[in-house]
Amino acid sequence: MNGVINIYKNTGMTSFDVVAMVRRVAKMKKVGHTGTLDPAASGVLPVCLGKATKIIDYIMENKKVYRVNLKLGMVTDTYDLEGEVLREEDASHITKDEILNCINSFVGTIDQVPPMYSALKQNGVRLYELARQGIEVHREARKITIYSIENIKIESNDNIQMDVCCSKGTYIRSLCYDIGEKLNVGATMTALERIQNGTFTKEEAINIEDLTEELLEKHIISIEKALDSFEKITVNEKFGKLLRNGVKVFDNRMYSEEVEFNKLYRVYEDNGVFLGLGKRDEKGFKLEKLLIEE
């Protein structure tokens, strides 16, 4: 069985728990998820089976949409409710307009410092392992992109909800923390749900608790379909043969569409055969991942 199943992970489970359950149902070992969701978070977790494990890294590049709840006036060491409260502030004076203006100021490409409680490594040691020892180290800010923040609901300063569309590598806990710091009262993430990963949506996801062999076979998505978030280009069979053989082709006649530099595309021959994912640079166009079904 080769393909991707759109799974909904419940709170309290690790992402590896989901993989283990899919392995049991599918009766196969070659299974992997496409981006960790913390146990306290829920939501969309595409799981790749068989040859589809080759495209895990590409699905992880997708834009993600998270539904997040945060509380103003409280800061924890983990930036969420799992951690120890470090400080509390009175946030009752913060107005809705101030909150909205602050939240919207984070839209765009920004520098974000990852939290200490994260799986990133420093000198070979995971940051959360250092944090558990009470050690805090300097973390370099990383460029991330917040594409949009929509559906902002301010029920009270204790409960603000918003939908955040962001790039790979974004820490929503850090976003909440940074919003709180900018408002000078602190903030903590209180709930997190991933509602979309590229073309994989919450509405179409299968709850991991409901997964059966029959549901898996019915809803598994082909490798080709799972890459729908990448734009499509078509080449003729002559150039297709060169690409299949790993040749980098420098010839603008090979594609009819406008092809940007350093951008991944789904590549098809003009007879409809899906070849894989390719990228153009100054020296030509080459398949980065050959995915043709033999």
Curated annotation (Swiss-Prot):
Keywords: Isomerase, tRNA processing. GO terms for biological process: mRNA pseudouridine synthesis; tRNA pseudouridine synthesis. It comes from the Bacteria. The active site is at 38 (nucleophile). GO terms for molecular function: RNA binding; tRNA pseudouridine(55) synthase activity. It holds the Pfam family TruB_C_2. Signal peptide: none annotated. It catalyses: uridine(55) in tRNA = pseudouridine(55) in tRNA. Belongs to the pseudouridine synthase TruB family. Type 1 subfamily. This is tRNA pseudouridine synthase B. It comes from Clostridium perfringens (strain 13 / Type A). The lineage of its organism: Bacteria, Bacillati, Bacillota, Clostridia, Eubacteriales.
